[in-house]
Amino acid sequence: MIILKDGYKEFADCMYYFLHYYIGYGRYTYSATNGSCDKGEYLDKRHNQCCNRCPPGEFAKVRCNGNDNTKCERCPPHTYTTIPIILMDVINVENAQPDHLIR
């Protein structure tokens, strides 16, 4: 177990998402073990496969289908996501609650 000092958890999470989504980790889906998946993934119950969640600032352009993983795309200008997500939509900044925005 690695213990991180205050403020380094965000860095570790950022590196995890970078490796997981951009270097090629998680490129393919895999069968869920005991109905659970790794951090940054979700269980697609239709196929019993572990699939990538899109990182904050991106949305699912194409959901995983049992063979190919989720295809994420950056949110368009003036929209956002704040959490790893599997939705195929983003939130318009004009409709956002003020406490949801990062300035």
Swiss-Prot record:
What intrachain disulfides are recorded? C37-C50, C51-C64, C54-C72
Could you tell me which Pfam families the record lists for this protein? TNFR_c6
Native source species: Vaccinia virus (strain Western Reserve) (VACV)
Which UniProt keyword terms apply here?
Answer: Disulfide bond, Late protein, Repeat
Recite the other comments. Answer: The A53R protein from Western Reserve and Copenhagen strains are predicted to be inactive because of mutations that introduce stop codons or frameshifts when compared to other poxiviruses.
Q: Where are the TNFR-Cys repeats?
A: 36-73, 74-103
Under what name is this protein listed? Truncated secreted TNF-receptor-like protein A53R
User: What family classification does the UniProt entry report for this protein?
Assistant: Belongs to the poxviridae A53R protein family.
